[in-house]
Amino acid sequence: MANPTSMSSAVHVYRRFVPQPVRSAAATTVPAGVRRKVKGGLARTLSRREARLHRRALRRVRRAGLGQSERRTTAPDGRIAHVHTGLTVDLARRLDHDLVTHALDAAEVPWFAVPALDDRRLCLAVEVRDKGTVRRVLRALLEEHTGYVVSVSPSAADTRETPGSHIKAWKHYGRARVIRLTWLRTDPTEGLWVGEDQGIEIEFWTANTDLPHERLIGPRPNRVQRAVPAEALGIEIGLDRLSGYCDIDGDLGPTVTLENFDVVRLEEISFPVDAVLLWQHPTPWGEELLRAALRSVHQYAPWIDVVHVVAQAEPPAWLEADERISVVRAVPGAEWRLDQLPDLAEHFLLMRPGALLGRPVRPFDYFTPGGGTRPRRGPWNASESFAEWVRAAYSVTGRATGHGYAAGPQPYRADTLTRLGEAGARSLPVPDEQVLSGVPGTHPMDGMAHHFGYVAGHADPSGEASVALHAALPGIGTHLQRLLVRRDVQQLQFFGLGTGEAGSGGGTNAVVRFLHQYYPVPSVFECDRPQTDTEPDRHS
């Protein structure tokens, strides 16, 4: 007997081509057995045609050499994932994009990229008249390189665990206006999982001739425009222009869009952003903090232009000499004069020991398009209100502050530090936060600089989630495990790894183990990063 999906297709074709009066007459005059036989034959015919077209699409995909990974593995939820050495969130996004676009090219389906509603995803548009061809080539692609498909509009996620090579995974495709393809990917340690909240969305655009000039109409609004001229010119555009999470490297391959979508988005940052990392503790745990900070930048902020390591001690031997990293020797307290760093961009992220990025971030998360900073608000209590930096900030600006600033990566403008010095602000004592017995309040330099920028209109404090933990915290392992499972915090800050309580209580070792698990993929800044030689599986 034909499978239910084929029977449903047969019924659809039967209802489409046989008028309702004829069907009503047949229901009363033709025996039920004959009707079942006719419908069954139609279902078998459609099933054979679908299988033939699927094999043809699969041959196209295989000739194009699509779908390569080192090996396959099983994700914790039972789905199939692909293993890639050196995996990053941005690399996974580009792999997904290249897979889909090359498959559409192999099937000779015209497409163009459009700004997605969510920056985490990329979106492609095809005409609705190519919907049948698109389904066949994408189903073949998902068989060659196992992935999953769901309907986005209308929403139907009940197929998220069904491999896209199965025809039942496409049961909502007929009425879908937007679909999403996802591939689960992981690194060889299977500690980093990517793909669940990413994927490639495909919109089906319709031709409209209501006006003298034919237009293409999108199935949903986007961040630029929903209708474009059918004869609009196609242009190449970098993926970083469509998603703020993408690498800004100009050597990476572009995508294709229409000239109508080549506009500056509201949240698009056009200026370069550097990162400044402080190296202060030449100890094993100090090296692990630096290594984790570099990995977090490499993994979650590929748009960072140059990384500057301000070394107040002998730099680790494993730091890789590269055009994207600069190591500068400095004396303690030099962070007050970071604006004097050679070749430092006007805008930069300052990451002190223990400051980490916890998930993918955009430049817009830390800076405004006009060049202002977006520091994180922190706790405010009686002891904080009497801190030395509060009095110093008031003496410089003449304005009282009403909140502190959270620990973690800090957005800075070099000219703010310059103007702060010109205003006569004195350099406050900077504590070594890794030897403090508890979680400190606002860092004096952050409080001074952010308040000064806020008063001048160059800072706009925000409230994104951040977590600060002391290594001597009782039961810290539970907190670390929760962070490892959820991976939903934008920025992290660890304190007290150099205290005796953290060392004797196992907190320092627990944090180091957590860093190894949270950031398993080596960065390009490490010369001792392991290399894995594996034969790629071309039929995964």
From Swiss-Prot:
Coiled-coil portions: none
Keyword set includes Zinc: no
BP GO annotations: polysaccharide biosynthetic process
Entry's Gene Ontology molecular function annotations: transferase activity, transferring phosphorus-containing groups
Keyword terms of this UniProt record: Exopolysaccharide synthesis, Transferase
InterPro entries: Stealth (IPR047141), Stealth_CR2 (IPR021520)
Pfam families attached to this UniProt entry: Stealth_CR2
EC id: 2.7.-.-
Other comments on record: Stealth proteins are part of a protein family that is conserved from bacteria to higher eukaryotes. Family members were first identified in microbes as proteins that help pathogens to elude the host innate immune system. Microbial stealth proteins are involved in the biosynthesis of exopolysaccharides. Stealth proteins are predicted to function as hexose-1-phosphoryltransferases.
Family under the similarity heading: Belongs to the stealth family.
Protein's name according to its UniProt entry: Exopolysaccharide phosphotransferase SCO6022
Species of origin: Streptomyces coelicolor (strain ATCC BAA-471 / A3(2) / M145)
